[in-house]
Regions:
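Short, low-complexity disordered leader/linker segments with a strong preference
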Residues: 1-57, 337-340
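N-terminal (or domain-start) structured segment
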Residues: 34-135, 185, 198-221, 233, ...
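Hinge/capping helix and adjacent helix->loop/strand transition within the periplasmic-binding protein
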Residues: 53-54, 106-111, 126-210, 259, ...
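Ligand-binding "clamshell"
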Residues: 109-110, 126-139, 198-199, 233-244, ...
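Ligand-binding pocket segment of bilobal, Venus flytrap-like solute-binding proteins
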Residues: 174, 179-181, 185-256
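C-terminal lobe and pocket-closing loops
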Residues: 230-298, 323, 327-330
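Mature extracytoplasmic/periplasmic domains
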Residues: 294, 298, 302-323
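Extracellular/periplasmic bilobal clamshell ligand-binding domains
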Residues: 317-340
């Protein structure tokens, strides 16, 4: 691997309540987010042969408050409204998502426990953190899409992308970029370095809340992040998004320019939030979740709850999700191999 990441000692005293797509920490369980339930509460007629026999655990490889967690809670809220079934979010963050992944892989394949997240299981495998990828699971449907994470800088230090690149070229290997080995953003940062022709000092700054703390205190120069976690800092004039590895800009992230539009040829996979079940889960169980996710996303209130985050409603069947996972795995593997 290009370099070993060194832990960054965080000294800032402010406390923030955010979390990223991945993170580190202990497992916690929490109920679905509150709020008005669908008007069809408990009244959805499911045609599947199988149905949950009790409370369903949605295992999230991240702490509470980030994009993965909030979209999982949105599903839990509206799925309960449709079916009357309790869905609880279990935050099991740590070790680049492998804590949550292993928890699900060791669970019974009875449909009562599943992993919810994006391509983190693939990145952890490519980085050598785990010896399995998406193929160790039975894929379920996909519920939402978050555009690929943008790269953010402290507005007091850098005005825009050009200012950051100039500073990085003037001090090779000295500007600090936050990521975590095996995290979704790890290869994103490495690919950005290559595309921009710069050399950064990669540091493990912990979870998204830790990264934000380090950014605000001036301990790091660059951090990746989901737009929903950084939006308030952009609006406050504290952060500048220097770009995101989009094929083209998204309407849902109006303050995030595509690197391609700024002259940097750099595209990276989006975060597509899918359901991962233990191996050999019965097709009847998968059919139930295919149908349920489709019904949830037909609800205008559920759609609005996602776009208000802001995250995009995005439905794929289990079969389509498996094909999408294969594409994402191969894409990130190619990026990793090109950087070796």
């Amino acid at each position: 691997m290009k370099r070993k990441l060194f832990a960054l000692a965080l000294t800032a005293t402010m406390v923030l309540g955010l979390a990223a797509c991945g993170g580190s920490g202990s497992s916690t369980a929490a109920p679905a987010a509150g709020g008005a339930e669908s008007s069809a509460a408990g009244g959805a007629e499911m045609t599947s042969e199988w149905a949950p026999s009790g409370t369903v655990s949605i295992v999230v490889p991240a702490g509470a408050g980030g994009d993965t967690d909030l979209t999982a809670r949105t599903f839990a809220q509206y799925a309960k409204g449709l079916t009357g079934v309790d869905f609880i979010v279990v935050n099991a963050n740590g070790a680049s998502g492998s804590v949550a992944s292993n928890q699900v892989l060791q669970s019974a394949n009875d449909g009562m426990t599943f992993l919810y997240g994006h391509t983190l299981v693939n990145v952890a495998n490519i980085a050598g953190i785990t010896d399995f990828n998406y193929t160790a699971f039975t894929l379920g449907p996909t519920f939402a899409k978050n555009p690929a994470q943008g790269l953010y800088v402290n507005a007091e230090k850098y005005a825009d992308l050009n200012a950051f690149i100039e500073a990085a070229k003037a001090a090779p290997g000295q500007l600090k970029a936050a990521t975590e080995v095996g995290a979704y953003t790890y290869y994103e940062i490495l690919a950005f370095e290559k595309a921009a022709g710069i050399d950064l000092d990669l540091v493990d700054a912990g979870s998204n809340s830790d990264k934000i703390t380090a950014m605000l205190s001036g301990q790091i120069d660059l951090m990746p992040g989901a737009y929903l976690n950084c939006k308030e800092y952009i609006e406050a004039g504290q952060f500048v998004c220097i770009g995101a590895p989009y094929e083209e800009a998204y309407d849902i992230t109006p303050e995030v320019p595509a690197f391609k539009d700024e002259g940097i040829d750099f595209v990276y996979p989006d975060c597509d939030y899918s359901f991962y079940f233990p191996a050999d889960t019965d097709p009847a169980i998968i059919a139930y979740y295919d149908e349920l996710v489709a019904k949830v996303l037909e609800d205008p209130e559920a759609q609005k709850a996602l776009t208000d985050l802001p995250v995009m409603p995005f439905y794929l069947t289990s079969e389509e999700s498996a094909a999408n996972e294969e594409t994402m795995y191969n894409t990130i593997k190619e990026i990793a191999d090109s950087l070796a």
